[in-house]
Amino acid sequence: MNFNKEKYPTLALAETPESLRLLPKESLPELCSELRSYLLDAVSQSSGHFASGLGVIELTLALHYVYKTPFDHLIWDVGHQAYPHKILTGRRDQIDRIRQKNGLHPFPSREESDYDVLSVGHSSTSISAGLGLAVAAEREGLGRKIICVIGDGAITAGMAFEAMNHAGELHSDMLVILNDNDMSISENVGGLNNRFAQLLSGSFYTRLREKGKKAFSAAPPIKALLKRTEEHLKGMVVPSTLFEELGFNYIGPIDGHHIYTLVHMLENMRHLKGPQLLHVVTKKGKGYTPAEKDPIAWHAVPRFDPLSGTLPKTVDSIPTYSNIFGDWLCDTAATDPRLMAITPAMREGSGMVRFSREYPKQYFDVAIAEQHAVTFAAGLAIGGYKPVVAIYSTFLQRAYDQLIHDVAIQNLPVLFAIDRAGLVGADGQTHQGAFDLSFMRCIPNMVIMAPSDENECRQMLHTGYLHPGPAAVRYPRGQGTGVALQPLFPLTIGKSEIKIQGEKIALLCFGTLLSVAREVAIHLNATLVDMRFIKPLDTELILAMASNHSLLVTIEENVIKGGAGSAVNECLMSHKKTVMLLNIGLPDQFIPQGEQNEMRAAYGLDSRGIQKQIQAYCESEM
């Protein structure tokens, strides 16, 4: 993206944090305006996360202005909001390539920049990593500061509270900034609170507080009285002292869009000892009216016209797999009041908006709490209900112990609707659904299904819902194939379906790559099988294919190691069946960002790539 210095004269002077810190404070408001405008121009041309970044323009500038980054360590939780950070840290001219193949990472990435201290993408990891860095900084003894920025959603997760509890115990020097962009904790924002927060962060109050602790440490009753007095004073104008109980010195809330207040506050807090928490209230989408009015719709956007203020409307007649799932939920709930649908803060992405409105008493958004979501489902199942957990493949990783300990061991009837399985596209390595088959396949009692199209997805959801034990249906991001939807009926568990009868080569396909594999089968005169079930496998069919064909090829959008192909390998070995076998899937590496079909082609999972791998394998065996 060509940077227009005439349009952004102040931003041109702030190419790095070092150059930013040379600017006078009086230039910061104009810099905020230019940075916000530049972000709008860049994302509207390239697509990407948008509303979150608009909401932290002032905070990002203030942090890099006050702290000596990258020597001082700045950590962004999740990273949706880090576009302004990337622009200010030497990546301004590359921002139009963010989330694209060979472009900037969609989130902070250690391999991309020294300013990205922690590679992120999942939520609620910042405080734990920050505390580890704080302990390391103490032992280093160079005066390095640690700052973590976490949102009001991410801070509700158990991991964040575990980290804060430990930080309070260790009493290490670190600053946690709570970016409250939903007004979910407090609405007490204004001049009085800004002034009071400045007083609480100032040197006079801090010295008085610390000296008082030392003076009355030998007199517990007086110390307790003073603590209650301090908490009462704070309680008159700030939220509850939950963070104080965890061992943090709480300051705020303050206006996160007043650059001078932020700079002054951070300058005050830079030298405070022990764990500090600064509560900053921001508005997601700040400065762009459409995004302010609907921050959810403008959270992640395609290319759009910033002047029109509208997002391009999709006119696709083929539904997404997420929508297929959401419609199935509604259809099933209409006949079964025992259905309980659970999501860990992914209502829109999982296609559950309609269900949440039509069946609010059967809908549970448990927030960013994947572990709780799974065990909550276990409790519902024990109580006689039929829980359905809608969860992204990458986020199910966070609840692996609960999947085993609380669901599978007890053989409870919990259905997992696993969205974003396989390659997800622009969100890159932290969000690829590459491992679920591998980590679920080894769990006893699990039934695991992978549909080849949207109709089969519905039938598998229905089958899993009726199954008396744990079941999982994994399906990809994006549209189906356009097939007609049939009335619901249960599939025979563990049975596959031959789609094309060929000779010599048998393609055993697990999931939606079946449509691609069909082209290969026709070209090679190969047998094509829709395997449907990863667990239990259709052992009878696999052995028959091994007897009637000279080469078996497994195809899956999961890592090869431990995946569906590995299951076929194990099956053949256990039955002492010798046949040439080629496993096609994702390699043993983390897959970067890029469009889904673009990345499938890059990793040999399009028709051309699959055929090329088969031909190369056959030639090597000749």
UniProtKB/Swiss-Prot annotation:
Disulfide bonds: none
Family annotation (SMART domains): Transket_pyr
Ligand binding (thiamine diphosphate): H80, G121, H122, S123, G153, A154, N181, Y288, E370
Pfam families per UniProt: DXP_synthase_N, Transket_pyr, Transketolase_C
Highest taxon listed in the record's lineage: Bacteria
Gene Ontology MF, one: magnesium ion binding
InterPro entries registered for this protein in UniProt: Dxylulose-5-P_synthase (IPR005477), THDP-binding (IPR029061), Transketo_C/PFOR_II (IPR009014), Transketolase-like_Pyr-bd (IPR005475), Transketolase_BS (IPR020826), Transketolase_C (IPR033248), Transketolase_CS (IPR049557)
Enzyme Commission no: 2.2.1.7
GO BP annotations, alphabetical order: 1-deoxy-D-xylulose 5-phosphate biosynthetic process; isopentenyl diphosphate biosynthetic process, methylerythritol 4-phosphate pathway; terpenoid biosynthetic process; thiamine biosynthetic process
Function field: Catalyzes the acyloin condensation reaction between C atoms 2 and 3 of pyruvate and glyceraldehyde 3-phosphate to yield 1-deoxy-D-xylulose-5-phosphate (DXP).
Protein name as catalogued: 1-deoxy-D-xylulose-5-phosphate synthase
Organism expressing this protein natively: Hamiltonella defensa subsp. Acyrthosiphon pisum (strain 5AT)
